[in-house]
Amino acid sequence: YIEISGGSLGHGLPIGVGMAYSMKLKKEKRKVFVLMGDGESQEGSVWESAMIAPKLNLDNLIVFIDRNNLQGYGRADELLSYEPIDDKFRTFNWEVIRIDGHNVNEIIKA
């Protein structure tokens, strides 16, 4: 089920980090899935969360980024380039897998 709907202002990943950390502390064998947009990745709270998650060893946190190049005020890459986003997440020690989000088999495999 969906626990929260964070909207487009970068709140989903910080909340997801908090939920995943809480589950780790309680030794719960659950996973947190965060679906966010590439435009949302222009928010500072996303990057703060991206930096802290690996430090907390949150291997129970899975993040999907919809790379549709859209955000509230236009095309994401015209307003603030975030590319190469894969490399940015890898710099913070994330395991990054690029998939076709329209392919259910690729999602399950990832």
Predicted regions: what they are:
Residues 1-110:
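Glycine-rich ThDP/TPP pyrophosphate-binding loop and its adjacent helix/strand module
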